[in-house]
């Protein structure tokens, strides 16, 4: 066995192990709610795992993803063989097609420099086209095939607002929670990246002039999350405290790296959607729930762009400062004409 074959087999085994563990685990973690008497996901986290694995391994993750979802579907859902095949196609085809198109448009390195390059294309194709493609294929499958009543609502049998929330759960999973799996999995696969992540994102928090600010910021975030996710009901605090979280994360853009901000934002959103008894107090309709999901998705996009804009401005500022220092050094020397 040559080295290339060995590396491919090694990557396949690692990707398969990740899928077999992370896909069922993410399905278990996925927050849910009741809309019009039917159970609906608020964020379908297996899509986040799929995206993270694709971004890590590329086309070599296709077979592990198919096997991981096949095993998960067999374990959780009782269907006929044809229904299993149709369900697997609906879950994965749109993602594979969108990633293939991105590779054609951006080249072989389309998975690199996240999130520094081609933000708009990645958000459009992976954050919106993939979820819409998954739901359109499921609606078409529900029209052509019969599925059990327990899952028929996911194939277009639910009300309009139910379907809207269902689509938003996929968009939210792609845009908010993908990095929540991407960074930890990358650190598990490559311990060197874990050291890099510590040095770039975590260590400066404790050994920096803004360490007091970060400590107070984390305490405030934890307090607000504890209040919103507490097991009690209060119409006074409910969702009215939610804007404070947006303000906190906006303030942190200039002091934390995007990798750490995205992890903290995903963890905060997951807690809010999972322990939502107080956070969603007074939300009695699918329309209100749809609005809340829209706000979370919109802020995730804004957070990405604001972080990117700040990072770019810092790069430009360092470039200008370096140019100024170089100009000052040259200004200390007499001109060649004067010397001659």
What residues fall within each predicted segment?
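Short helix-perturbing small/polar motifs within transmembrane alpha-helices
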Residues: 2-41, 50-148, 178-190, 203-241, ...
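Transmembrane helix-loop junctions at the membrane interface of multipass transporters and ion channels
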Residues: 144-151, 274-286
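Short aromatic-rich membrane-water interface segments that cap or initiate transmembrane helices
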Residues: 157-172
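Conserved nucleotide-binding and Mg2+-coordinating catalytic segments in signaling enzymes
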Residues: 320-340
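Cytosolic signal-transmission helices at domain junctions
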Residues: 193-198, 311-322
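Active/binding-pocket-proximal capping segment
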Residues: 240-244, 266-272
């Amino acid at each position: 066995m040559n080295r290339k074959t060995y590396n491919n087999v090694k990557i396949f085994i690692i990707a398969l192990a990740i899928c077999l563990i992370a896909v069922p685990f993410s399905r278990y973690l996925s927050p849910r709610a009741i809309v019009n008497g039917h159970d609906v996901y608020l964020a379908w986290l297996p899509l986040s795992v799929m995206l993270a694995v694709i971004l890590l391994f590329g086309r070599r993750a296709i077979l592990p993803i198919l096997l991981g979802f096949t095993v998960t579907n067999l374990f959780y859902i009782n269907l006929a063989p044809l229904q299993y095949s149709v369900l697997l196609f609906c879950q994965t085809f749109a993602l594979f097609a969108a990633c293939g198109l991105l590779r054609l448009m951006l080249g072989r390195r389309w998975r690199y420099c996240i999130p520094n390059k081609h933000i708009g294309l990645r958000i459009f194709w992976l954050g919106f086209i993939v979820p819409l493609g998954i739901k359109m294929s499921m609606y078409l499958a529900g029209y052509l095939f019969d599925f059990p009543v327990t899952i028929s609502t996911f194939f277009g049998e639910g009300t309009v607002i139910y379907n809207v929330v269902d689509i938003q759960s996929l968009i939210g999973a792609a845009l908010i929670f993908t990095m929540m799996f991407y960074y930890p999995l990358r650190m598990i696969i490559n311990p060197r990246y874990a050291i890099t992540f510590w040095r770039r994102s975590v260590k400066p928090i404790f050994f920096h002039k803004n360490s007091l600010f970060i400590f107070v910021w984390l305490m405030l975030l934890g307090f607000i999350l504890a209040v919103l996710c507490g097991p009690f009901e209060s119409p006074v605090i409910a969702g009215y405290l939610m804007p404070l979280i947006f303000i906190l994360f906006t303030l942190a853009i200039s002091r934390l790296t995007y990798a750490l901000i995205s992890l903290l934002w995903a963890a905060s959103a997951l807690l809010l959607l999972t322990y939502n008894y107080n956070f969603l107090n007074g939300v009695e309709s699918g329309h209100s729930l749809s609005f809340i999901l829209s706000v979370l998705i919109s802020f995730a996009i804004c957070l990405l762009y604001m972080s990117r804009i700040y990072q770019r401005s810092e790069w430009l500022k360092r470039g200008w400062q370096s140019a100024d220092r170089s100009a000052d050094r040259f200004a200390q020397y007499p001109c060649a004409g004067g010397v001659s």
